[in-house]
């Protein structure tokens, strides 16, 4: 009886882990289309104000620098 309960709990636990770790492919498709659209909208005129990667930034300094960590711009599209 104890072994059966332990097996049931183990199966439920492993099932929950699988559900938590599963990818949601619908989100990936939505974000890839958004990135493609944003890439098409960015022209040379809009890229002039962007900071290069690893340059100094502030929190509200540049709209192109999405991650300003320790005053460094880490991601610049």
From Swiss-Prot:
It is found in: Secreted. It comes from the Eukaryota. Disulfide bonds join 50-65, 57-68, 64-73. The presence of a 'disulfide through disulfide knot' structurally defines this protein as a knottin. GO terms for cellular component: extracellular region. Residues 23-44 form a propeptide. Belongs to the conotoxin O1 superfamily. The lineage of its organism: Eukaryota, Metazoa, Spiralia, Lophotrochozoa, Mollusca. Residues 1-22 form the signal peptide. The keyword Metal-binding does not apply. Its main location: secreted. The keyword Protein biosynthesis does not apply. Keywords: Disulfide bond, Knottin, Neurotoxin, Secreted, Signal, Toxin. Coiled coil: none annotated. Expressed by the venom duct. This is Conotoxin ArMKLT2-0122. GO terms for molecular function: ion channel inhibitor activity; toxin activity.
């Amino acid at each position: 009886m104890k072994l059966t309960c332990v097996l049931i709990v183990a199966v439920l636990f492993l099932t929950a882990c699988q559900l938590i770790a599963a990818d949601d492919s619908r989100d990936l498709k939505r974000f890839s289309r958004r990135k493609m659209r944003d890439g098409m909208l960015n022209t040379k005129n809009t890229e002039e104000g962007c900071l290069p990667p690893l340059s100094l930034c502030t929190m509200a300094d540049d709209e192109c620098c999405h991650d300003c960590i320790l005053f460094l711009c880490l991601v610049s599209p």
